[in-house]
Amino acid sequence: MAAATSATAIVNGFTSPFLSGGKKSSQSLLFVNSKVGAGVSTTSRKLVVVAAAAAPKKSWIPAVKGGGNFLDPEWLDGSLPGDFGFDPLGLGKDPAFLKWYREAELIHGRWAMLAVLGIFVGQAWTGIPWFEAGADPGAVAPFSFGTLLGTQLLLMGWVESKRWVDFFDPDSQSVEWATPWSRTAENFSNSTGEQGYPGGKFFDPLSLAGTISNGVYNPDTDKLERLKLAEIKHARLAMLAMLIFYFEAGQGKTPLGALGL
C-alpha cells in the first residue's frame, strides 16, 4: 500500500477600512489542507484561522479623523510608546531623525522628572527657592569647585560620551575594553534589546520590568511596555512643568509659592 502526505498553506492578507477606522489593517487567512492515504482510506482536514484586526492609531486630538499629515502623519504608525501622531512640523519624517528625537525626549524627560522632584523637595527642606539655591557666596558648599568640575566634566561627560557612541553603534560599549573596571561587561549590555531601555541588574535593580534568575536578567515584555508608556507620559508632564517653573521664576515665584504652600 502506498502512503502519501501533502500539505499546503496559503496566507492571504487583506485590509478592512471598517475594522481599522479607515486605515489599512492587516489580517491573515491561513488555509491548511492535509491528506493521508493508506490503501483506499483518505482523511481530509481543513483549518481556517483569522487573526484579529490591528488596533487603529490613536490621535492627539480625540475623535478627529483625517486632516492629512498634520493630524495623522504617515511616518508615525503608533509603534512607539506614547505615539499619538503629534508631529505638526514633520520632524520625524526621516527614520534616523525620529530615532534620535525619541532618544532625546527620553533623556530630557528623565532629567526633568528628577528636576521637578528636586525643586519641590529642596524648597520644602530648606525654604530656599530653586533659582536661588547657589546665590549665597558665603554658604558652606558640600564640595569644592574642583570636585564639581571633575564630576560634571570628567565623570558625567565620560558617561554621556559612551551613551552617544552606543546610540550609533548599539552594544559597542558592553565589551570588556569599554568597561575595564567591571568584571563582567554583560552587566552593562542592553538586556531588553531596545534603544533607551537597557534593563539588566544595574539599570533595573528592583526588577520592575523583568526578573533575575541565577544572576541572569529576563525582561518581562508586558511589564516593560506598560512602564515605557507610563514613563513617557510622566516625562512629558515633567518637561511641561519645568517650562512653567521657568516662567514663574521670571516673576520671582516658586512652585510651592504658586500653590500657596
From Swiss-Prot:
<dbReference type="GO" id="GO:0009768">
    <property type="term" value="P:photosynthesis, light harvesting in photosystem I"/>
</dbReference>
<dbReference type="GO" id="GO:0016168">
    <property type="term" value="F:chlorophyll binding"/>
</dbReference>
<dbReference type="InterPro" id="IPR001344">
    <property type="entry name" value="Chloro_AB-bd_pln"/>
</dbReference>
<feature type="transmembrane region" description="Helical">
    <location>
        <begin position="111"/>
        <end position="131"/>
    </location>
</feature>
<keyword id="KW-0602">Photosynthesis</keyword>
<dbReference type="GO" id="GO:0009523">
    <property type="term" value="C:photosystem II"/>
</dbReference>
<keyword id="KW-0793">Thylakoid</keyword>
<keyword id="KW-0148">Chlorophyll</keyword>
<dbReference type="Pfam" id="PF00504">
    <property type="entry name" value="Chloroa_b-bind"/>
</dbReference>
<keyword id="KW-0472">Membrane</keyword>
<keyword id="KW-0150">Chloroplast</keyword>
<keyword id="KW-0809">Transit peptide</keyword>
<feature type="transmembrane region" description="Helical">
    <location>
        <begin position="139"/>
        <end position="159"/>
    </location>
</feature>
<keyword id="KW-0604">Photosystem II</keyword>
<keyword id="KW-1133">Transmembrane helix</keyword>
<dbReference type="InterPro" id="IPR022796">
    <property type="entry name" value="Chloroa_b-bind"/>
</dbReference>
<dbReference type="GO" id="GO:0009535">
    <property type="term" value="C:chloroplast thylakoid membrane"/>
</dbReference>
<keyword id="KW-0812">Transmembrane</keyword>
<keyword id="KW-0934">Plastid</keyword>
<keyword id="KW-0157">Chromophore</keyword>
<protein>
    <recommendedName>
        <fullName>Chlorophyll a-b binding protein CP24, chloroplastic</fullName>
    </recommendedName>
</protein>
<comment type="similarity">
    <text>Belongs to the ELIP/psbS family.</text>
</comment>
<dbReference type="GO" id="GO:0009416">
    <property type="term" value="P:response to light stimulus"/>
</dbReference>
<feature type="transit peptide" description="Chloroplast">
    <location>
        <begin position="1"/>
        <end position="51"/>
    </location>
</feature>
